[in-house]
């Protein structure tokens, strides 16, 4: 599946004039609060459009944070870093990629899309399967899915910028409502 998606993205790339890359990078850079990698461990997932293999970027990858995020969110034509082309990291396994937290004692999974997946259940790519795997390996896992107010505010078009303020407010309110529960989780 990832290889087919990558091939389709590469076809779009071949038909484009290349200007989308510069615009996409500028868009991503403008939306990040900082263009420097955090000191804490942050893993950003993309999929190599040529091979279909997942790639995980971190501060030691030699890739700018803006480029890693742009590659991870590339939907349509792939995003180029050097000679490589990448597509959305959600195609790796799921938009959460929670399985990358294997080995940690406590894992907090934020699932803004509510754990939805288009993959068949038997593929084991759904969020529930990843959470089960983490727990089987000894992790304590808490998963936060959007509540109904957050889902309504977020809407169905992930790229609609008009939903950002109401979605942020709804997410903030949900976070405040969950604060005590999450405090207990981290104790």
Could you tell me what each predicted segment is?
Residues 1-187:
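Patatin-like phospholipase
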